[in-house]
From Swiss-Prot:
Pfam family, one: HMA
Listed GO CC annotations: Golgi apparatus; membrane; trans-Golgi network transport vesicle membrane
Residues annotated as binding Cu(+) 2: C91, C94
TM spans (from-to): 263-283, 304-324, 336-356, 371-391, 529-549, 578-598, 902-924, 928-950
Gene that encodes the chain: CCC2
A molecular function GO annotation: P-type divalent copper transporter activity
Catalyzed reactions per annotation: Cu(+)(in) + ATP + H2O = Cu(+)(out) + ADP + phosphate + H(+)
Residues the record lists as binding Cu(+) 1: C13, C16
Protein name: Copper-transporting ATPase
The keyword Iron is assigned to this record: no
PANTHER family (alphabetical): ATP7, ISOFORM B (PTHR43520), P-TYPE CU(+) TRANSPORTER (PTHR43520:SF8)
Topological domain ranges for the Cytoplasmic compartment: 1-262, 325-335, 392-528, 599-901, 951-1004
Compartment(s) where it occurs, according to its Swiss-Prot or TrEMBL record: Golgi apparatus, trans-Golgi network membrane
Subunit composition and interactions: Interacts with the copper chaperone ATX1 via the copper anion.
Length: 1004
């Protein structure tokens, strides 16, 4: 499978995107097609039955200019791995039954079932089976089962693909020599290169390589041996992306057309409107150009000038509309260009017909013929001006994305010789992992990494939304795209290119434009039938008024003062107004422009929103479920003290045990593990000891079990909660945690099967957690907390943030979190639940919830499972929950703006089309085509300007007032649902055991 990304120019509304989508999906070999009207990008997935060039031709056949930005192969994932819970197994026979039955499923490659953890790990081929099939098979065996995790299996995360442009082209070689060209690259296969592919046009080389063995600069250096020169084709070509987002070409095109058509329109208006109205004697006295020509009777100089000017505008500036209209009609669809083309052609053709008719049948009184060249020119002029303003406004909707792209520098300085401290400047595309990069004051940081030398203050507003300089020193992480302050430092790169956090943010924002809100489906449907419907209405309008004039003894005032020819003209003019006043673009732009601005504002304030569907989901959320550690609390846990069991009688070296504890905890990335490691690092006694982990097992929901060796001694180490440290062992030891401060987390340690002691660990609540939770409650949301921590710790945090104890669940496993989320969803019939977590052990619950919200810190984003990612910093000041309030406010206001845009677009068409059809003609009110064109041009502009109003968004004051004024104050449906709603009450029993080294106390 391959994926091609194309830039498509000339799309104006959803009818254009629907036309392209329909044609591409009908093409054999195309499996997926996504089009963004705002970013002008088309992303197509296809197989070997079609080529990128043929896809480009299809788009061009639809009447749009198109260029290929990137064409690359998609790495196929042959297998996936999944994790299922299996409840009810009692012995090895149960394990054997489950293993045998699941292994018998076609496509399953490996099955491992654990009786202790009650889990089943499956590796399977997604092309042949699914994890759901395995779950059903387990349940058929008589056991309860749930899917915990379903992710990639053998996808090699170290494998990278690079596309190189050949500057010394292969076509210079003869076919005989060309066959040996491929052989020149074979030596690369021994250096870490997985595959080499030469493009059909011989201009590009696609290489897959292992980035652990080979860097991009190393690859280019080896390629020099072939005798050819290469440059890296960057997927993040900033210049191309910025050019597309700024719409420079479109702005330039419509600006030129607007100037030309407006200048000529002014001349035509002088000839046909202003002079006859202001100085009628000039027309009556037949002063030039209102004088009849001497060589053709009935032909006036005014009309010669008019037909020349109108023909130029109609077939020069208007050629764009003809081309687009013909392309859409070829595929059985219509766009706004079709309506413009039909209306201007009607006015132009009528004028030419009147001119020719007057030449063959001149008036005996020398009366000037009825000519409306000014109408066709003015319509094109108004539309061109409207398009120019609309494109300008649309370019402003993507400023947030443009600013993020601009944060990536084009070059950077790396240490080329460590001993001599020599630096060299390289393009950012050539940056490799583990490079040492020099950052001077004011420079942009090119990659994610860790500071190795020096210190500074850095602007990380792309993460937090606040331009507060964050102090950084040796060992602190830095993020690509952040801007250095006054200091000078060096850092080692950890992720580069498309794997950086900035690249992920840009990717999420761009993909958000491809995700349509369900409400947009209605707009797309209306747009698909809009043009045919308007043309039918225009024809009906013409014939109905002609019929009324023929049978009516008392025609409307607009017709009584005119001849039959004039009445025919008014009927035609009325029908033309119907065609030109209709505006499908307003409907098509209502949703995507608001989504682009809303997601851009969110990104600027540390909130990543994954498209329109997420925005619509947020509008129906009634309940928020919080994780505790890392979400309501800072996640920076600290060991307050270590209590050794007074009954311990084992003959072991305590320093060696602490060294083994540190080595064991190094396996996990859990906040509790990090706290214990820091505590062990602070003890001088074990710094000289080097413990080696021989075996280890992470027991989900309970802790870690390992076998360690230090100084030739072997220890069986077990660290975790009471469920892991067998209750019998605790009872035998007589060791209880009565001396532990209530509200702290407890992690027990056993050595060689006997309880050794416990760690008492504390985690502080975030400084704005209380204000955020109260903000939600003030605005009618139900709040819950589900944690794997013990009862006392859960109560302490709930008390501090203001969550009712009846809505708090403790000692809950990841699977248990899913069960509780389902339980809360089922309350009151249709409860919509948003889960807020930090991504550690939360992925299943985030995926199961109606809306998953991940709190992201550090340099990794929990993007996959969450619908919304809230970015925050690592330090206590920027590690904030306030972003949740921002996410709610932005999402609700953006969705409200979408509905307002659609309401305005529908009201405009519903109101203006009947007026254009002549419902007010009995009262002498008509809508001339020129005014209709002006109204239509500015209707779409007004929708874009409405979306741009979202840029004025300011963060809500969570300390005082909330969002009820725009969420539901004026919603009748919400009023009645709240009036008869009841408060959700927690169940009597919590679900037990959660991942993470926690003690297992009484259930709330």
């Amino acid at each position: 499978m391959r994926e091609v990304i194309l830039a498509v120019h000339g799309m104006t509304c959803s009818a254009c995107t629907n036309t392209i989508n329909t044609q591409l999906r009908a093409l054999k070999g195309v499996t997926k097609c996504d089009i963004s009207l705002v970013t002008n990008e088309c992303q197509v997935t296809y197989d070997n039955e079609v080529t990128a060039d043929s896809i480009k031709e299809i788009i061009e056949d639809c009447g749009f200019d198109c260029e290929i930005l990137r064409d690359s192969e998609i790495t196929a994932i042959s297998t996936k791995e999944g994790l299922l819970s299996v409840q009810g197994m009692t012995c090895g026979s149960c394990v054997s039954t489950v293993t045998k039955q699941v292994e018998g499923i076609e496509g399953v490659e490996s099955v491992v079932v654990s009786l202790v953890t009650e889990e089943c790990h499956v590796i399977y081929e997604p092309s042949k089976t699914t994890l759901e099939t395995a779950r059903e098979m387990i349940e058929d065996c008589g056991f309860d089962s749930n899917i915990i995790m379903d992710g990639n299996g053998n996808a090699d995360m170290t494998e990278k693909t690079v596309i190189l442009k050949v500057t010394k082209a292969f076509e210079d070689e003869s076919p005989l020599i060309l066959s040996s060209v491929s052989e020149r690259f074979q030596f690369l296969l021994d250096l870490g290169v997985k595959s080499i592919e030469i493009s059909d046009d011989m201009h590009t080389l696609t290489i897959k390589y292992c980035c652990n063995e080979l860097g991009i600069r190393d690859l280019l250096r080896h390629l020099e041996r072939t005798g050819y020169k290469f440059t890296v084709f960057s997927n993040l070509d900033n210049t191309t992306q910025l050019r597309l987002l700024s719409k420079e070409d479109e702005i330039r095109f419509w600006k030129k057309n607007s100037i030309k058509s407006t200048l000529l329109a002014i001349i035509c208006m002088l000839l046909y409107m202003i002079v006859p109205m202001m100085w009628p004697t000039i027309v009556q006295d037949r002063i030039f150009p209102y004088k009849e020509t001497s060589f053709v009777r009935g032909l006036f100089y005014r009309d010669i000038l008019g037909v020349i000017l109108a023909s130029y505008i109609q077939f020069s500036v208007g050629f764009y509309f003809y081309k687009a209209a013909w392309a859409s009609l070829k595929h059985g669809s219509g766009t706004m260009d079709t309506l413009v083309c039909v209306s201007t052609t009607c006015a132009y053709t009528f004028s030419v017909f009147s001119l020719v008719h007057n030449m063959f049948h001149p008036s005996s009184t020398g009366k000037l013929p009825r000519i409306v060249f000014d109408t066709s020119i003015m319509i094109i002029s108004y539309i061109s001006i409207g398009k120019y303003l609309e494109t300008l406004a649309k370019s402003q909707t993507s400023t947030a994305l443009s600013k993020l792209i601009q944060l990536t520098p084009s070059v950077c300085s790396i240490i080329s010789d460590v001993e001599r401290n020599e630096t060299k400047e390289i393009p950012i595309e050539l940056l490799q992992v583990n490079d040492i990069v020099e950052i001077k004051p004011g420079m942009k940081i090119p990659a994610d990494g860790i500071i190795t030398r020096g210190e500074s203050e850095i602007d990380e507003s792309l993460m937090t939304g606040e331009s507060i300089l964050v102090p950084k020193k040796t060992g602190f992480p830095v993020i690509a795209g952040s801007v250095n302050g006054p200091g000078h430092f060096y850092f080692r790169t950890t992720t580069v290119g498309e794997e950086t956090k900035l690249a992920n943010i840009i990717k999420v924002m761009k993909e958000a434009q491809l995700s349509k809100a369900p409400i947009q489906g209605y707009a797309d449907y209306l747009a698909s039938i809009f043009v045919p419907g308007i043309l039918i209405l225009a024809v009906l309008t013409f014939f109905i008024w002609c019929f009324i004039l023929n049978i009516s003894a008392n025609p409307p005032v607009a017709f009584t003062a005119n001849t039959k020819a004039d009445n025919f003209f008014i009927c035609l003019q009325t029908a033309t107004s119907v065609v030109i006043v209709a505006c499908p673009c307003a409907l098509g732009l209502a949703t995507p422009t608001a989504i682009m601005v809303g997601t851009g504002v969110g990104a600027q304030n540390g909130v990543l929103i994954k498209g329109g569907e997420v925005l619509e989901k947020f509008n129906s959320i009634t309940t928020f479920v919080f994780d505790k550690t890392g979400t309501l609390t800072t996640g920076f846990m600290v060991v307050k003290k270590f209590l050794k069991d007074s009954n311990w009688v084992g003959n072991v070296d305590e320093d060696e045990v602490l060294a083994c504890i540190k080595a064991t905890e190094s396996i996990s990335d859990h906040p509790v593990s990090k706290a214990i490691i820091r505590y062990c690092d602070g003890l001088n006694c074990n710094k000289a000891l080097n413990a080696v982990v021989l075996e280890s097992e992470y027991v989900l929901g309970k802790g870690i079990v390992s076998k360690c060796q230090v100084n030739g001694n072997t220890y069986d180490i077990c660290i975790g909660n009471e469920a892991l440290i067998l209750e019998d062992a605790l009872k035998k030891s007589g060791f209880i945690n009565s001396n532990v401060d209530q509200g702290n987390t407890v992690s027990y340690v056993s050595v060689n099967g006997h309880v050794f002691g416990l760690f008492e660990i504390n985690d502080e609540v975030k400084h704005d957690s209380y204000a955020t939770v109260q903000y939600l409650q003030r605005n009618g949301y139900e709040t819950y907390m589900i944690t794997g921590d013990n009862n006392s710790a859960a109560k302490r945090v709930a008390r501090e943030v203001g969550i009712s104890f009846e809505n708090v669940y403790s000692d809950v496993s990841p699977t248990g979190k899913c069960d509780l989320v389902k339980k809360i969803q089922d309350k009151e019939g249709n409860n919509k639940v948003a889960v807020v977590g930090d991504g550690i052990n939360d992925a299943p619950a985030l995926a199961l919830s109606d809306l998953g919200i991940a709190i992201s810190t550090g340099t990794e984003i929990a993007i996959e499972a969450a619908d919304i990612v809230i970015l925050c910093g690592n330090d206590l000041n920027t590690n904030s929950l306030r972003g949740l309030a921002n996410a709610i406010d932005i999402s609700l206001k953006t969705f409200k703006r979408i509905k307002l845009n659609l309401f305005w677009a529908l009201c405009y068409n519903i109101f203006m089309i009947p007026i254009a059809m002549g419902v007010l003609i009995p009262w002498g009110i008509t809508l001339p085509p020129m005014l209709a064109g002006l109204a239509m041009a500015f209707s779409s502009v007004s929708v874009v300007l409405s979306s741009l109003m979202l840029k004025k968004w300011t963060p809500p004051d969570i300390e005082s007032h909330g969002i009820s004024d725009f969420k539901s104050k004026f919603s009748i449906g919400n009023f009645w649902s709240r009036l008869f709603s009841t408060r959700a009450i927690a169940g009597e029993q919590d679900i037990e055991s959660q991942a993470g080294l926690m003690s297992n106390e009484e259930v709330l």
